[in-house]
Amino acid sequence: KQIVRYLVVLQDGRLFVVNTRPGDDAGLTLASRTNVYRSPGQDTWYDELLTSGNRILVAGYSYAEQASEITVLTINDAGQLQREATYYISSNDYYDIENYATRLVNGNLVIYTPLDVSNVNPRRAMRWPVVRRWLRDGDRRAVTTEGRSLFDGNDIYRPVQRTLEPIVHSVSVCPLGDLSAGDELECRTTAFVGGEDREFFVSTTDIFLWVTPNPYDA
């Protein structure tokens, strides 16, 4: 991604900032680099890089937290990076080689998250998705805020036809604002039940999500 004179590159959980006009001349020099991950052994897969103004967002999936991980950073005029916040949004692994899950639109984070409910134990209380802010790393898992609920069973739109392998598909719109220390994300979420396969598209004014059954389940 390009921000003014800088190229921002995501590689193996690291961000590299390359100055394309060092000394106002043509060329390439490394301005800064930082790790998105906080530990080399962290079980997280980073695969999406978004930019808006001087803000950078890296999305991935944390298998330890069983959540989508969103890290927000800023870049200054010298190309130096500063971490603003890291959030966890409860979900199954969203990765799709042919599609994306996040977008930045008019200062809002727009994120798609799936939740597989085909094997829910009816004898146990359902743990509905929440969005949590990272505070510090613990011995085995991250220490986070309690978080805010995204939706519960009463908020989900039922499918219009019988669904063999039901997935709760949700789209959340979360204003990023200033992200002051301790702030939670205030997300508006729409959730509905559908088939496993999906296509996600976001414009500046609308969000589209198509879902279809997995052809192998037919």
Regions inferred by a protein language model and the residue ranges of each:
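Beta-sheet-rich non-transmembrane sensory/scaffold domains
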Residues: K1-A218
